[in-house]
Amino acid sequence: MPTVEELYRNYGILADATEQVGQHKDAYQVILDGVKGGTKEKRLAAQFIPKFFKHFPELADSAINAQLDLCEDEDVSIRRQAIKELPQFATGENLPRVADILTQLLQTDDSAEFNLVNNALLSIFKMDAKGTLGGLFSQILQGEDIVRERAIKFLSTKLKTLPDEVLTKEVEELILTESKKVLEDVTGEEFVLFMKILSGLKSLQTVSGRQQLVELVAEQADLEQAFSPSDPDCVDRLLQCTRQAVPLFSKNVHSTRFVTYFCEQVLPNLSTLTTPVEGLDIQLEVLKLLAEMSSFCGDMEKLETNLRKLFDKLLEYMPLPPEEAENGENAGNEEPKLQFSYVECLLYSFHQLGRKLPDFLTAKLNAEKLKDFKIRLQYFARGLQVYIRQLRLALQGKTGEALKTEENKIKVVALKITNNINVLIKDLFHIPPSYKSTVTLSWKPVQKVEIGQKRTSEDTSSGSPPKKSPGGPKRDARQIYNPPSGKYSSNLSNFNYERSLQGK
């Protein structure tokens, strides 16, 4: 093992040789042997090996292996020095190997070391993006779980910081190709991260790019397979995939496949859905997603059939008035309760799809069914008016801090929901029914997004196909209030949210 003095002497030989460095192979071998010495010798070797690496291609493997030994040394200061110098080995055919090594080193728990690895990866990314991606994806596909996890997070956080001259169209195509391989077997959280990566690529910001992403999500959602409402993994996967798809839809990128699947497979099984997460109102969550997608549904093959399924489901939540005895009192039937949150979603979805078949209520339903529907609408509208007046009275004169209390936040949301339902019911009362009114769903930002405008992909905390529990989609901070799913009914029960309307 060489001493410190021998290392300096051989360094001097190489430094003084200028253009004839490659003739002093023995001197470079002495420096390589420095990795077997003590702490001081290793520190010097960590600096000297990369400095002359390019002059000895025949010793490339030995040099990289020597530096890798230092990257795994017990002494953290030696590891840091060795990692810092790794980009100097990233030349030609060695670069993918260096990228592979650096990706493996992401598993370190030392924060300073972790930052060095990140910086080194970014450094070689700028030298050769394709080669670096080769190393990263190699570990994502075949590496240890911790390495895979951190490599994916590296891509999801660092790609967006790279300039356009690094992320060329060819590089983005490689990212898409490799990502598709990974997406064949991913956890929920990984799926969400990859959607974040892909939706951020410049080449996928176009209409055709967004369409590619929607098809990718549809494949993950397994829309060709029958829906299994009792399987929490199946429910979870559909929820998370749909959450990822919703921000991609626009007037040019249609939600038709998803809306069709929801109408045909999910709505008929709504009451038997197994919730994948405790405390989640799974039925309301599904109806919210359907409502958001319905605005961007294109031409549907079985429109009348699916509209009828949606209509039938709406009827379940729009009760008939209770029968009255001769004296005008309740005849003993239980007073119906109005589930406003559900009705907002279903009525909005029906209103959106109904535009595509405007004579559905007048020509496709028989007179008796239409009369029944009008009675239900009228009863619901009567209850709405009572409740809207109560809410407005309760919120009258309240501003600033007063509106920030939990109770008042809930009332504000309830007012948005009931106002939306009121507008939609008025449309359907027209003769013939009208589908012209526009409302903003109660949980969405008040500020409208132009139909053709690009929307930013929503991020989620974790998600599924099919192994992870879902985290709800991140909502826009501009909205007034958005309580967790199911909170409307439970918390507003104290404020007669699901109102009994007998005698009103």
Swiss-Prot record:
Record key words, sorted: Acetylation, Apoptosis, Cytoplasm, Nucleus, Phosphoprotein, Repeat
Cross-referenced InterPro entries: API5, ARM-like, ARM-type_fold
SUPFAM superfamilies the UniProt entry points to: ARM repeat
Annotated stretches, region: Disordered: 452-504
Coarse class of the protein's main subcellular location: nucleus
Record's subcellular location: Nucleus; Cytoplasm
Motif (Nuclear localization signal) on chain: 454-475
Keyword Membrane assigned: no
Entry function: Antiapoptotic factor that may have a role in protein assembly. Negatively regulates ACIN1. By binding to ACIN1, it suppresses ACIN1 cleavage from CASP3 and ACIN1-mediated DNA fragmentation. Also known to efficiently suppress E2F1-induced apoptosis.
Family (UniProt): Belongs to the API5 family.
Record-given protein name: Apoptosis inhibitor 5
Organism, scientific name: Mus musculus
